[in-house]
A protein has these predicted regions:
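A conserved beta-strand->alpha-helix junction
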Residues: 230-237, 303-308, 316-365, 371, ...
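Short glycine/proline- and charge-enriched loop/turn segments
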Residues: 50-54, 242-243, 324, 349-361, ...
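Secondary-structure transition/capping motifs at alpha-helix termini
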Residues: 269-276, 296-306, 314, 324-336, ...
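Generic hydrophobic alpha-helical scaffold/packing signal
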Residues: 259, 263-267, 283, 292, ...
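Mobile late-domain/C-terminal helix-loop "cap" segments
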Residues: 435-455
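Active-site adenylate/phosphate-handling loop in enzymes that bind or generate adenylated species
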Residues: 108-112, 117-129, 136, 158, ...
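Enzyme catalytic cores with a strong preference for nitrogen-chemistry domains
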Residues: 1-281, 292-303, 308, 328, ...
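Short glycine/serine/threonine-rich phosphate/pyrophosphate-binding segments
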Residues: 288-291, 315-317, 375, 398-399
Length: 455
């Protein structure tokens, strides 16, 4: 038989859209001769649904979408992840749909408790394993943490599974795939059972799911590896109750994976929240340069605008480098001096509050004031156009508080909030290896905030 993995990008709360995407995957799988197709965890509702699960209308919409899937699926078996309801309880569920009926439903038994989604707050815990027999093959069905956190090898052996199917919404972090391989290897070593993983792909708020679904046979050999950060429908051929070796997508370098994760995070945050585009302050520095490169790669040059807002402390080379980069990427670039506004603010403060400018340069007020003027202008443009402001601060700056509240922190999405300053430089070098979009001087030049003389 043939099994299809539906590595799809679902949107939280868009049950009709998610159902349509699942049905499209089902159609492709049927045309390719698959007898079974599996989706990621909670594919029907999107992941993580969080407090939407507390809304009756949301839960009803999930149930309606599931009913629609049941009616539409024919000639193939579908295992779909969804919120499940039984006896007044809510579960993280996977239902087996076959010939217009739900023939089995599995309820997740190990619930995630993470900073971004505490499943135990919303879901009840399942108690029973699920066994699906299809085409003479005995499948065990698990959902994400059941496999990653549970010791299932004894149960799998006792149940005499041939293949374990894992529906996952496993979020990306550096070297995450290595960890997945290790856990799967360990399970196979103890059980001798093949494993098929179907993982979610896409950005959802601050999370990025990398996909990278894979299959390992009972010898612990990787037989299929789907791509990272892309949707895919992949067929796995099963012979003698084992997956036959198929397509192995070449793994990307660490920098390539990180860069693609950042691009997908930006793309889906903008797309799924309905923003027409993005804008950012381009300073001529390395952080805003990398943010711009990511934004353009994610959204396209026509959907990104940049604003250079120099003061009397801005060096000419900053103006030149910002202009050059905007030209290299083909984005609409504005230049708006804040010098007059800055001086008017200082005069107003001096006149009304009898606060004299600090000649020693020890006060942060004039520096923060410049950042806040820039933030105000960017937010005004955002309100006018509907485009989201991308902030450009990196993880190192945020961690030590080297940033300005209501200034460079003003915006809707912090692209580099989990990227250290050292990694910023590495990512700039990586991006320029593909094509030169960041002027070399931006990367090589010593960093400066340019908020006071000779800084």
């Amino acid at each position: 038989m043939k099994i299809a993995i539906a590595q799809i990008n679902c949107t939280v709360g868009d049950m009709p859209g998610n159902a349509a995407k699942i049905l499209d995957a089902v159609k492709q799988a049927k045309q390719a001769g698959a007898g079974l197709i599996i989706t990621p965890e909670l594919a029907l509702s999107g992941y993580p649904p969080a407090d939407l699960l507390l809304r009756e209308a949301f839960c009803q919409s999930c149930s309606d979408a599931l009913t629609g899937l049941v009616k539409a699926v024919d000639g193939i078996t579908l295992i779909v992840g969804h919120p499940g309801f039984q006896d007044g309880k809510l579960f993280n569920a996977a239902s087996v749909i076959q010939n217009g009926k739900i023939i089995q439903t599995y309820y997740k038994r190990i619930l995630n408790k993470t900073a971004f989604f505490d499943e135990s707050y919303y879901f009840d815990t399942g108690s029973e394993p699920c066994i699906l027999e299809l085409a003479g093959i005995k499948f065990g069905i698990y959902i994400c943490a059941d496999f990653w956190l549970g010791d299932l090898s004894i149960e799998a052996n006792r149940r005499d599974f041939d293949i374990v199917l894992v529906l996952s919404a496993s979020a990306y972090h550096i070297n995450k795939q290595v960890s997945r391989y290790q856990i799967t290897h360990r399970f196979i070593q103890h059980s001798g059972i093949s494993v098929i993983h179907a993982n979610l792909v896409g950005g959802q708020d601050e999370l990025v799911f990398d996909g990278a679904s894979f299959v390992m046979n009972r010898q612990g050999e990787l037989t299929h590896q789907l791509g990272e950060f892309v949707e895919a429908i992949e067929l796995i051929e099963i012979r003698n109750k084992q997956p036959v070796k198929g397509k192995l997508t070449t793994p990307q370098s660490s920098m390539a994976s990180i860069y693609q994760a950042l691009c997908l995070g930006v793309k889906d945050y903008v797309r799924k929240n309905g923003f027409p585009g993005a804008l950012l302050g381009l300073s001529g520095g390395v952080d805003s340069a990398l943010t711009l490169a990511i934004a353009v790669d994610a959204l396209g040059a026509d959907n990104v605008k940049t604003v250079m807002m120099p003061s009397q402390y801005t060096a000419n080379i900053s103006l030149d480098d910002a202009h050059e980069m905007a030209e290299l990427l083909g984005v609409k670039h504005y230049e708006c001096s804040i010098t007059a506004l800055f001086e008017q603010y200082l005069l107003k403060i001096e006149t009304d509050f009898q606060i004299l400018p600090d000649s020693t340069g020890s006060s942060a007020m004039p520096e923060n004031l410049q950042a806040r003027i820039r933030g105000t202008l960017l937010m005004a443009l955002s309100n006018q156009s509907g485009s989201i402001v991308l902030t450009t601060g990196n993880k190192s700056e945020i961690a030590v508080g080297y940033c300005t509240l209501y200034g460079d922190m003003a915006g809707g999405f912090a692209v580099l909030k989990d990227v250290s300053k050292t990694m910023v430089y590495q990512l700039c070098e990586y991006r320029n290896q593909m094509s030169r979009v960041i002027p070399e001087r931006i990367i090589r030049r010593a960093p400066s905030a340019e908020l006071r003389p000779d800084q």
